[in-house]
């Protein structure tokens, strides 16, 4: 492995590119790989990601690289920033090139498709238990990270040394703070469920329900996230942090969120395909909705908001009817 490369980022979309830019600005030589060779070659030529992060110039220490084997041989620190539905596929791609020295982190927000398993379980299944694992999650929009605007995230993992090392790579005293969490499950889960609730917030606003309804939805969405997390062994208090409440509020209230905009379009009467085309990038919450629904039903946890969003997206339920069914539920203790 090369001595000078600090980390390789796998995933050259908006968020992967933004995190790579941030790492390089922190003084860490960084490689950036993506599955489309022509896209990486454009990044090499343009020294920016014009498609996803226009006008953000790459620092000198950031190098786009087309060869996956070269990227993995250059450093032991690997960061996956790919959609959750291809997370397992990318792990299978890199597995032949891994050595016992490698350490695997991800900033992917989601669960395994169909099963709803945590990505930690997916990684362990594919790679075995030898490799240290870590996750980075929190209230972050790619463009704001790329611009160097103040940002804070949570980092959690299977091994404290690696968790601390990843946190240190991102942390600086100017605009990027990292908070280390000891709750690996909570930090993984928050990023998936908040995407679903953000679609719901968009749906509510698209229907014209107003700020009261949006706030109620966020609050009850946090309750659903917490209930699911505790059932999986997470601590209730963990969901009040960056990867829980922080990410939930950001994604539900700002139109930089693809998930919120997707829900907004649906609430205004557009179809699923038309809404996805309008967004123009992956809407993680669409798949996350099915993942969370499957997980909650598998372990028997009631999540009425997520359930109604699932019915809208996957069973053609009318948006207004889903809203009415939520509003007509029997009163209950908070």
From Swiss-Prot:
Q: What class of enzyme is it?
A: oxidoreductase
The pathway it acts in is:
Membrane lipid metabolism; glycerophospholipid metabolism
Residues annotated as binding sn-glycerol 3-phosphate are 109, 138, 140, 194, 247, 257-259
Q: What is its EC number?
A: 1.1.1.94
What reaction is this protein's catalytic activity?
sn-glycerol 3-phosphate + NAD(+) = dihydroxyacetone phosphate + NADH + H(+); sn-glycerol 3-phosphate + NADP(+) = dihydroxyacetone phosphate + NADPH + H(+)
Task: Please list the GO biological process terms of this entry.
Answer: carbohydrate metabolic process; glycerol-3-phosphate biosynthetic process; glycerol-3-phosphate catabolic process; glycerophospholipid biosynthetic process
Q: Which InterPro entries match?
A: 6-PGluconate_DH-like_C_sf (IPR008927), 6PGD_dom2 (IPR013328), G3P_DH_NAD-dep (IPR006168), G3P_DH_NAD-dep_C (IPR006109), G3P_DH_NAD-dep_N (IPR011128), NAD(P)-bd_dom_sf (IPR036291)
> What's a Pfam family this protein contains?
NAD_Gly3P_dh_C
Keyword annotations for this protein, in alphabetical order, are: Cytoplasm, Lipid biosynthesis, Lipid metabolism, NAD, NADP, Nucleotide-binding, Oxidoreductase, Phospholipid biosynthesis, Phospholipid metabolism
Where's it found, cell-wise?
Answer: Cytoplasm
Q: List the disulfide bonds.
A: none
Residues that bind NADPH, according to the entry? 14-15, 35, 109, 142, 258, 282, 284
- Record: active site: 194
Q: Name one GO molecular function term.
A: NAD binding
* Cellular compartments per GO CC: cytosol
Source domain of life: Bacteria
Which NCBIfam families does the entry mention?
PRK00094.1-1, PRK00094.1-2, PRK00094.1-4
Q: What does this protein do?
A: Catalyzes the reduction of the glycolytic intermediate dihydroxyacetone phosphate (DHAP) to sn-glycerol 3-phosphate (G3P), the key precursor for phospholipid synthesis.
The record's comment on protein family reads: Belongs to the NAD-dependent glycerol-3-phosphate dehydrogenase family.
Write down what this protein is called: Glycerol-3-phosphate dehydrogenase [NAD(P)+]
Organism annotation: Psychromonas ingrahamii (strain DSM 17664 / CCUG 51855 / 37)
Query: Gene encoding this polypeptide?
Result: gpsA
């Amino acid at each position: 492995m090369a001595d000078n490369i600090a980390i390789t980022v796998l995933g050259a979309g908006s968020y992967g590119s933004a995190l790579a830019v941030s790492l390089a600005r922190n003084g860490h030589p960084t490689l950036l790989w993506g599955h489309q060779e022509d896209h990486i070659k454009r990044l090499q030529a343009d020294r920016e990601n014009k498609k996803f992060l226009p006008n953000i110039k790459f620092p000198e220490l950031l190098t786009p690289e087309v060869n996956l084997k070269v990227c993995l041989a250059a450093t032991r620190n690997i960061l996956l920033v790919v959609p959750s539905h291809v997370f397992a596929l990318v792990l299978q791609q890199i597995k032949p090139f891994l050595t016992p020295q490698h350490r695997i982190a991800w900033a992917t927000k989601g669960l395994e498709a169909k099963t709803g398993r945590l990505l930690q379980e997916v990684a362990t299944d594919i790679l075995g238990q030898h490799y240290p694992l870590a996750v980075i999650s929190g209230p972050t929009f790619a463009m704001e990270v790329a611009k160097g605007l103040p940002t804070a995230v949570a980092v959690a993992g299977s091994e404290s040394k690696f968790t601390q090392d990843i946190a240190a790579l991102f942390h600086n005293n100017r605009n990027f703070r990292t908070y280390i969490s000891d709750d690996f499950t909570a930090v993984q889960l928050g990023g998936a469920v908040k995407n679903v609730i953000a679609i719901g917030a968009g749906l509510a606003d698209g229907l014209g329900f107003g700020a009261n309804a949006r706030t109620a939805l966020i609050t009850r969405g946090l309750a659903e996230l917490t209930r699911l997390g505790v059932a999986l062994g997470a601590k209730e208090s963990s969901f009040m942090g960056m990867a829980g409440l922080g990410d939930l509020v950001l994604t539900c209230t700002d139109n930089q969120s693809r998930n919120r905009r997707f829900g907004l379009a649906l609430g205004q009467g557009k179809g699923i395909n038309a809404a996805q085309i309008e967004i123009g990038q992956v809407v993680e919450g669409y798949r996350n909705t099915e993942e969370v629904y499957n997980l909650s039903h598998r372990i028997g946890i009631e999540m009425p908001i997520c359930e109604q969003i699932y019915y809208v997206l996957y069973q053609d339920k009318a948006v207004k009817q889903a809203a009415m069914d939520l509003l007509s539920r029997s009163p209950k203790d908070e």
